[in-house]
């Protein structure tokens, strides 16, 4: 872009950080909120909530910039990504690097308000976010790595609330890995032909004709692990009701993706926001129900 105005430049940064597409923030935020509430004996501390919500927005935005930096030589060959700011020249490589660094720095300053264990965990969290885009070059299922990166707020949440990393935090993280493989395979089914042409790896390519089966199997593993967490943490019936609603949402996704229509697969991917929300409502309701019983 030649001599862009301030408004045009800010709009380009807005698109680069995907703030115009909040689904990524929500898919990152829901597991973090599950972790915060499941780790808390009651309503979580306000500072912890603020740091994690703001940090989620900042690091998801930074991750999008890092992703586009890594993929800038590929995105022009993919129909869905050829208008990204780094491809069109609306944002320079130097500007993108500085933006990613600035966002990460602000997120780190927020983390410094919490305990030393959370601060220590922020370093592998940053590494996961920065390295994920490169895994599409050599991992057959980079979506599994994405699940770890997107779910790392879970052990950080337990560390912030309890000062420890109990087994439940890691089970919840593993559950999130299966969920991420499920929803990001739906996403990858949209780009499969383009990814094959440019040599990018994805779970949709790896699973091939078994892609739909793999997605549903991952949903199943995710829900089983979430139920295990609920049993271990002695959650009340609304938690498991939330899992039941999530299972119905997953079945709806099967109806969307079984014919492998690109638009329907993308719709299923976006719809995972409601699956995450259903579980969070179940977590909140379970906490309220248990508090009501204890107060009697």
From Swiss-Prot:
It is an enzyme of class 2 (transferase). GO terms for biological process: ubiquinone biosynthetic process. It is found in: Cell inner membrane. GO terms for cellular component: plasma membrane. The keyword Transport does not apply. PANTHER family: 4-HYDROXYBENZOATE POLYPRENYLTRANSFERASE, MITOCHONDRIAL (PTHR11048:SF28), PRENYLTRANSFERASES (PTHR11048). It is a multi-pass membrane protein. Belongs to the UbiA prenyltransferase family. The gene is ubiA. The chain crosses the membrane at residues 23-43, 46-66, 99-119, 141-161, 163-183, 211-231, 237-257, 265-285. It holds the Pfam family UbiA. It catalyses: all-trans-octaprenyl diphosphate + 4-hydroxybenzoate = 4-hydroxy-3-(all-trans-octaprenyl)benzoate + diphosphate. Its main location: membrane. It comes from the Bacteria. One of its GO terms (molecular function) is 4-hydroxybenzoate polyprenyltransferase activity. This is 4-hydroxybenzoate octaprenyltransferase. Its EC number is 2.5.1.39. Its cofactor is Mg(2+). Pathway: Cofactor biosynthesis; ubiquinone biosynthesis. InterPro entries: HB_polyprenyltransferase-like (IPR006370), Prenyltransferase (IPR039653), UbiA_prenyltransferase (IPR000537), UbiA_prenylTrfase_CS (IPR030470), UbiA_sf (IPR044878). Keywords: Cell inner membrane, Cell membrane, Magnesium, Membrane, Transferase, Transmembrane, Transmembrane helix, Ubiquinone biosynthesis. Catalyzes the prenylation of para-hydroxybenzoate (PHB) with an all-trans polyprenyl group. Mediates the second step in the final reaction sequence of ubiquinone-8 (UQ-8) biosynthesis, which is the condensation of the polyisoprenoid side chain with PHB, generating the first membrane-bound Q intermediate 3-octaprenyl-4-hydroxybenzoate.
